[in-house]
Amino acid sequence: MQRGLGTFAAALCLATASPAFAHHSHPLVYDWCKSVTVEGRVESVEYKNPHSIIVVRQDDGTAYTVDWLALDALTRDRILESAKGALAFGARVSVTGAPIRTLAEIQKSFPDFKGEVNPRTIDPWQIRRVGDTFSWALPQSPNPANCAGVFRTPAR
């Protein structure tokens, strides 16, 4: 009985972990061999669970949105508490991160991938804001420095 219950519990954990792994599969979605850096002034910050959002506007007027991923409540609280002063409106920040892969790049690197990619993450689009921690650039641009995009940053 104990063994059967343990096997059932393990199977249940694995079954429910798959969707979470797919959602947070960073090597699949981000190209960690490249990096993109954006510098500018903080336009707004939204502290919320599970992703806080920071908007940064470059001196040329281009805006980026950074989706700040926090790993757990303790980490999130610590990061948000320490970041509140540094990320005040008008503060100058530098954001560096890995650019998002295109659907074609994902399928080339992971031939068995049969899923879908949210079109918002692979199509070029002008973004209103930028944040600070790990980043994406728009995939169609040959020069990531000229991209307007969404950035994601791993919590530290």
Describe each PLM feature range.
Residues 1-9:
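Bacterial N-terminal signal peptides that target proteins for export
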Residues 76-95:
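Short nucleic-acid-contacting surface segments enriched for D/E, G, S/T with interspersed K/R
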Residues 61-71:
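A short macromolecule-binding patch
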Residues 48-57:
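Short aromatic-glycine-enriched beta-strand elements
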Residues 40-42:
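Conserved hydrophobic positions within beta-strands
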Residues 21-36:
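Short boundary/loop segments of OB/S1/cold-shock single-stranded nucleic-acid-binding domains
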Residues 100-142:
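OB-fold/S1-family single-stranded nucleic acid-binding modules
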